[in-house]
Amino acid sequence: QLQGYEFDKIFPGCRIIDIHEYLLEKGITLPSGQGGFLYHEPCHNPMKLGDSMKTVKSLIGDNVVKSERCCGESGTLGVTRPDVSTQVRFRKEEEIRKGEATLRASGTVAADANVKILTSCPSCLQGLNRYEGDLQNGLLEADYIVIEMAKQILGENWMPEYVQRANQGG
């Protein structure tokens, strides 16, 4: 959508790029072997320059299983039409369970460990958080790809440390 605004005419030399593609350009990736993840591709995927699974695997490693189907949130669908959203959610839950089984069978996620599902959409993140207690072995943890990367690269306290540095001017 932003491509239609022709920002380069207002700001010559500027370009619009997704954060995931920017991180790849800068060579910021997770070291290989950092565990397994489910990936939920949003209906409105911000990754426009290439195959999103290729981008995700380049960022966080090859141990990623794509979790198909809509999360059921679809903007405000979960709130405005819970009857429809619940049916969509049921199908997504089946996909999450399949992905969980694949990750556990491959050994990338231990039998008693939580499964992480990553996305890049705020609405989807809200929807995916609704599945938190639905797995049989452990919980489903939903987060953004870039947040998971920040946690693994900078540590669990990356956000308060970042805020503190920003408040101090740098």
Predicted region positions:
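Iron-sulfur cluster-binding electron-transfer modules in prokaryotic oxidoreductases
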Residues: 1-170
